[in-house]
């Protein structure tokens, strides 16, 4: 039945504003009659003005990005332009920029004094090597200020007190009282190497430390909830803020971790992280755990109950279970908690998983070197991603599986062995080298 016969046009137009832009297109693509309302749909994401102009959809976009260059310097600025980029050396601005512009980016080649022309409702300002004084012109609505390639003396004198999100770009000086008192997000910049701790405001909740930072973090304020450590950080972790909920660790870290906060929810190592030490201090609050490429330690008595997503790196190849004698019987003891729903193994994992998978698992990813037959898949598992080298013969035991994601080359080799299936949208995001297939059930 056509959806138009169920919902009238007015009802559909009430539904569409509540959907993401991609879902709006999918929704109206259900039938030809519904697709006819495309010209009156409004889109909410950011889109480049030039692209939408070619498609004739400028008036359908609420948030446009417009790049001003020497070629389009006299082009009319429309009311639905929210993000303006100034990429020209010519001094062409004669009046205050329109109030509809909430995000402004000034490139390093822009030479005009922009201060008097900053729009009154500006919320975000990005300065690329811009050294003219503008602080007195910044409106009280400004919340986000980002510096890129800007001298440290310029930075200190450009920050308005109402800024809550601050990124310092190439800054390599010291931190201090010049930081806004209401700051919540602080990115100290990729070149920052100084001391950090009580010299940042008590309001900071998210702290990003750059790739050259390798100083002590033992003095960080307890109010920090999100902490990202750069690629050069390699100090032992034995003290962290008590309220920390998310911790991200860069690829150069290979020191011991002897303490993690009790409220930590997310712990992620960089994909290329060289960390390879036992971790025995994971808190019960942890829900997402992602390990780096070189981690290859035992996980027995390591993972907490309550963990939902678990991802191992390419070189992990340790057992995930063991057989123990209990009473008069031999039983399998699993190392991965049953709470895990999404489990991903890396390229070189090739251990037996029969009986060792969590009973609540819904998605499993197996690497290209996995060659063992799998005969025990929990009934909850629906999605399996397979890579080159996997033994397709074991699929006969997987009656509950509904979807597979496999390499194109593997599919061509095994397509006659697969159960009856259909191809599901080869152009799906993230499926560049894969086919997603759906198993047909009798």
Curated annotation (Swiss-Prot):
InterPro entries: FNIP (IPR008615), STK_FNIP-Repeat (IPR051251). Keywords: Repeat. FNIP repeats lie at residues 213-252, 253-294, 295-348. Pfam families: FNIP. Coiled coil: none annotated. This is Putative FNIP repeat-containing protein L170. It comes from Acanthamoeba polyphaga mimivirus.
């Amino acid at each position: 039945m056509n959806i138009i016969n169920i919902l009238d046009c007015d009802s559909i137009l009430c539904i569409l504003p509540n959907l993401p832009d991609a879902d709006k297109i999918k929704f109206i693509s259900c039938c030809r009659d519904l697709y006819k309302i495309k010209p009156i749909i409004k889109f909410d994401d950011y889109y480049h003005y030039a692209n939408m102009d070619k498609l004739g959809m400028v008036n359908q976009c609420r948030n446009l990005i417009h790049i001003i260059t020497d070629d389009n310097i006299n082009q009319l600025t429309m009311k639905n332009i929210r993000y303006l980029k100034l990429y020209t050396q010519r001094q062409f601005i004669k009046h205050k920029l329109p109030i509809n512009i909430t995000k402004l980016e000034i490139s390093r080649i822009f030479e005009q004094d922009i201060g008097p022309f900053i729009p009154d409702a500006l919320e975000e300002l990005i300065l690329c090597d811009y050294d003219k004084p503008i602080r007195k012109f910044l409106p009280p609505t400004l919340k986000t200020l980002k510096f890129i390639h800007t001298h440290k003396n310029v930075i200190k004198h450009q920050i308005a007190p109402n800024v809550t999100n601050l990124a310092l770009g190439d800054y390599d000086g010291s931190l201090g009282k010049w930081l806004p008192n209401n700051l919540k997000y602080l990115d100290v910049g990729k070149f920052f190497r100084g001391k950090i701790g009580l010299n940042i405001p008590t309001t900071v909740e998210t702290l990003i430390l750059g790739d050259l930072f390798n100083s002590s973090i033992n003095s960080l304020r307890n109010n920090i909830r999100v902490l990202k450590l750069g690629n050069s950080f390699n100090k032992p972790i034995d003290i962290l803020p008590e309220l920390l909920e998310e911790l991200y660790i860069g690829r150069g870290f290979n020191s011991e971790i002897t303490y993690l906060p009790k409220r930590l929810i997310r712990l992620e190592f960089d994909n290329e992280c060289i960390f390879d030490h036992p971790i025995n201090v994971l808190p019960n609050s942890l829900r997402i755990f992602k390990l780096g490429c070189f981690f290859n330690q035992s996980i027995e008595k390591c993972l907490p109950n309550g963990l939902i997503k678990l991802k191992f790196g390419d070189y992990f190849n340790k057992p995930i279970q063991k057989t123990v004698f209990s009473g008069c019987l031999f039983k399998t003891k699993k190392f991965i908690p049953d709470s895990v729903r999404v489990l991903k193994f890396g390229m070189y994992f090739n251990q037996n998983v029969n009986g060792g998978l969590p009973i609540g698992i819904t998605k499993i990813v197996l690497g290209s070197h996995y060659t063992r037959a799998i005969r025990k898949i929990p009934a909850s598992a629906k999605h399996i991603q397979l890579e080159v080298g996997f033994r397709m013969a074991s699929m006969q035991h997987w009656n509950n599986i509904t979807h597979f994601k496999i390499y194109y080359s593997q599919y061509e080799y095994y397509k006659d062995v697969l159960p009856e299936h259909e191809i599901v949208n080869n152009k799906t995001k993230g499926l560049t080298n894969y086919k997603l297939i759906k198993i047909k059930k009798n």
